[in-house]
């Protein structure tokens, strides 16, 4: 049986066993396509059911999360934690609170996390979790009660050497605080390393808040350097206006680029003169308002609900909002308008059709598992500080982050070239991430 037939047969089986989970199917299909050339060159990676084991989570947890609102009404949400692979270290990955969360989305995120964490070079496995709870419009007390109920079940399954959750969409510093506080009460011990993204006064790390956005910009900067250019003077569009987008904007402008647009789920803002990051943070983090407020209050900025942020002419696009936000037509528009670099700050924000357009039009593309690995890398640095009862300076931690992102880019570029796909960072990221995990799994036996 040829490698193509082996992969096709396994993927057909995966579709049947995981019906109704399109995001998970999409993530697996992309990786399997890249791995065909590995299996042809190194057939031992097909031994002992390795591919099947890699695509099947070690553990999937689904649990009830009952909570009481401010009016005394009881609500019941569903909680998830997918502990996907621990060959390299304890499961590591965020918690997402959003109405769209279901098992398939958590599995897709957890699967991507395996390769992302592997690429960091740090000893962490892959996992992900969350709930279909919507924190929007909820009071602080309602969010606290939900987090406490969620942790009442989750605490049985996590620990600094077992599984270390963090934040994601809908889970920021406030939620991590409530989750950690309840874990501390349930476990009857102050186990700092059980969660990352903590507050600075109780075990958190400097740069963790900025890390995903900063890391994405460090990665795309390396992509640009590889073409003999500089990020300085480039025009950039950034989708989203949350944590990742905000700090990507901040770092890009620090390095001399001009960010000409950002967005949220309601619309997008054109900022031809650049973004006032302090104003954006005040609107989103303090007032928790829509991006339209930015356009109302900042001269030269305009708010739009028609069209798409991807319609703007730019040199670099950084999708930093959510999965599958950038489709094939958007990609064609970017290419027609002169975009030359795309790096994913979010998890799988580009559809397969968009990625294919990037390849066809020679747009250098940094996939999320590489470009947005700065967040989990700095989470692992937070774990190091917790384990040694230490606290590092902002400058030192940021330097570590820069080195990690440069090494990730170098690894992706060298691996892509080794397998005959020069400058295809998707192939490079998938193969490099896979080989490290696969070697560990083969060494540890069939478990």
From Swiss-Prot:
Name of this chain's protein: NADP-specific glutamate dehydrogenase
GO biological process, alphabetically ordered: glutamate biosynthetic process
Gene Ontology CC terms: cytoplasm; cytosol
Assembly, per entry: Homohexamer.
Family: Belongs to the Glu/Leu/Phe/Val dehydrogenases family.
Family annotation (Pfam families): ELFV_dehydrog, ELFV_dehydrog_N
Free-text function comment from the UniProt entry: Catalyzes the reversible oxidative deamination of glutamate to alpha-ketoglutarate and ammonia.
Disulfide bonds listed in the record: none
Taxonomic lineage of the native organism: Bacteria, Bacillati, Actinomycetota, Actinomycetes, Mycobacteriales
Gene: gdh
């Amino acid at each position: 049986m040829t490698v193509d037939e082996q992969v096709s047969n396994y993927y057909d089986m995966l579709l049947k066993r995981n019906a109704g989970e399109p995001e998970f199917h999409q993530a697996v299909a992309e990786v399997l396509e890249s791995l065909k050339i590995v299996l042809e060159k190194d057939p031992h990676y097909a031994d002992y059911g390795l591919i099947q084991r890699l695509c099947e989570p070690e553990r999937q947890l689904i649990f009830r999360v009952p909570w009481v609102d401010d009016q005394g009404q009881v609500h019941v949400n569903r909680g998830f934690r997918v502990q996907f692979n621990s060959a390299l270290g304890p499961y590591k990955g965020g918690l997402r609170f959003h109405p769209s969360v279901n098992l398939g989305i958590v599995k897709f995120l957890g699967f991507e996390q395996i390769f992302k964490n592997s690429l960091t070079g740090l000893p962490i496995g892959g996992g992900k979790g969350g709930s279909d709870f919507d924190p929007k419009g909820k009071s602080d007390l309602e969010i606290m009660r939900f987090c406490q109920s969620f942790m009442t079940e989750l605490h049985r399954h996590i620990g600094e050497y077992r599984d270390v959750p963090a934040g994601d969409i809908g889970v920021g510093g406030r939620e991590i605080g409530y989750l950690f506080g309840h874990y501390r009460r349930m476990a009857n011990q102050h186990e700092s390393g059980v969660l990352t993204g903590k507050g600075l006064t109780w075990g958190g790390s400097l740069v963790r808040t900025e890390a995903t956005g900063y890391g994405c910009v460090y990665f795309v900067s390396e992509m640009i350097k590889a073409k003999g250019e500089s990020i300085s003077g480039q025009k950039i569009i950034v989708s989203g206006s949350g944590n990742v987008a905000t700090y990507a904007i901040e770092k890009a402008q620090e390095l001399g680029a001009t960010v000409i647009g950002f967005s949220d789920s309601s619309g997008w803002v054109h900022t031809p003169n650049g973004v006032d990051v302090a104003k954006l943070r005040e609107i989103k983090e303090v007032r928790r308002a829509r991006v339209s407020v930015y356009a109302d209050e900042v001269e030269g900025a305009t708010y739009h609900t028609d069209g798409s942020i991807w319609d703007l002419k730019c040199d670099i696009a950084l999708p930093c909002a959510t999965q599958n936000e950038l489709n094939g037509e958007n990609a064609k528009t970017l290419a027609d308008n002169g975009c030359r670099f795309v790096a994913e700050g979010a998890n799988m924000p580009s559809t397969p059709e968009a990625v294919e357009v990037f390849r066809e039009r020679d747009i250098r593309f940094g996939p999320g598992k590489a470009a947005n690995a700065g967040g989990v890398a700095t989470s692992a640095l937070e774990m190091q500080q917790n384990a040694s009862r230490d606290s590092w300076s902002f400058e030192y931690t940021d330097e570590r982050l820069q080195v990690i992102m440069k090494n990730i880019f170098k690894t992706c570029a060298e691996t892509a070239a080794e397998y005959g796909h020069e400058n295809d960072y998707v192939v490079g990221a998938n193969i490099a991430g896979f080989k490290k995990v696969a070697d560990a799994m083969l060494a540890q036996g069939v478990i």
